[in-house]
Design a protein with these regions (language model features):
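Short, hinge-like loop/turn segments at secondary-structure boundaries
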Residues: 71-76, 178-179, 210-213, 246
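Walker A/P-loop NTP-binding active-site region of P-loop NTPases
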Residues: 24-88
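P-loop/Walker-type NTP enzyme "switch/lid" segment
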Residues: 59-131, 241
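Beta-strand-loop-alpha "switch" segments that mediate conformational coupling across diverse proteins
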Residues: 218-245, 258-261
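NTP-binding/hydrolysis catalytic cores, primarily Walker-type P-loop NTPases
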Residues: 245-290
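Conserved catalytic-core segment of NTP-binding enzymes
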Residues: 140-228
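Extreme N-terminal, non-catalytic leader segments
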Residues: 1-31
Length: 290
């Protein structure tokens, strides 16, 4: 091997090392209708405004929540990547302010029919997201189905969205209980962070967190972190009706500022090496169970 070729190989290896793992954050809820997907799109926008490249992966089976929130109909979805030969970049739909999203479509539901080699190829394709994004937001389904749990136990960071309504709090605890009982769950590798949505006052969100945190710590060995609260805001309702996130439609609103504050908290949190697993390892954990 000549000196020039050796130098080229060294540069190639250095460039490969420079590819950083994307930060993977799952957003979930114990029940539907509490603002989970709304949280996903607004957090994505706030990360993007801080200079991050953000892609939302819509893993809410059969429900096109993200495309509805953005008012955008995607040309391709995950099924086109899996079954129709499309490349990963082709199925990423451009959204507002540079945020991209991948629609699950019917593709996720068909995963059960894939053999191991097909799943390996799928994971290989999805792992390219490490090069295309700094932050991946996984918008999971609501509730405690096995498909939701597979995403949560693999996720180094999970944001649990709840409201002060008793049914929402009860369902949030049920989700945490199901998570704690999953054989693949590890409290060291899966950090759960709470957002209290639709609160009347900030104190209401803090009280909700303290109560849920106390019982989850005592009975489930899950230590919740508190990210903050989103208040009742008519601007959110108006933004939803026009199929735009409130952070885009009303950037000066109270709720938009709260989403910004939450992302600032997330940005200031140090990510340990065993929590910065990247996209490849995340999807391997989801789809390639031992």
């Amino acid at each position: 091997m000549d000196q020039a070729q050796n130098l080229r190989n060294i540069i190639k290896m250095q460039n490969q090392k420079m590819v950083q793992n994307a930060r993977v954050i799952s957003v979930t809820s114990g029940k539907g209708g509490v603002g989970k997907s709304n949280t996903s799109v607004n957090i994505a926008l706030q990360f993007q405004r801080q200079g991050k490249r953000v892609i939302i992966f819509d893993a809410d089976f059969g429900l096109a929540n993200i495309e509805v929130m953005f008012g955008i109909i995607p040309k391709y979805n995950l099924g086109d990547l899996m079954f129709k030969g499309k490349e990963l970049k082709e199925i990423i739909t451009p959204g507002p302010e540079g945020v991209g999203f991948i629609s699950g479509g019917s593709g996720i539901a068909k995963l059960v029919n894939l053999d191991k080699e097909q799943i390996k190829r799928l994971v290989g394709k999805l792992s390219e997201l490490d090069e295309l994004a700094d932050v991946i937001i996984i918008d999971t389904g609501a509730g405690i189905s096995s498909s939701v749990m597979e995403f949560l136990v693999a996720s180094p960071e999970t944001i649990l969205v709840t409201t002060p309504e008793p049914a929402s709090v009860t369902d949030s605890y049920a989700l945490l209980k199901a998570l704690s009982m999953n054989e693949d769950y590890s409290p060291e590798k899966c950090k759960v962070k709470l957002i209290a949505n639709r609160v009347g006052k900030k104190e209401e969100g803090q009280n909700l967190y303290e109560k849920l945190s106390a019982v989850s710590s005592r009975f489930l060995n899950i230590e919740l972190e508190y990210l903050g609260a989103i208040p009742f805001d008519n601007n959110i309702t108006k933004a939803v009706m026009t199929q735009e996130p409130v952070s885009l439609k009303y950037p000066g609103s109270v709720s938009s500022k709260c989403y910004e504050d939450i992302v600032n908290i997330l940005e200031n949190k140090e990510i340990s090496s065993h929590n910065n697993i990247g996209v490849r390892n995340f999807f391997k954990s989801v789809f390639l169970k031992k």
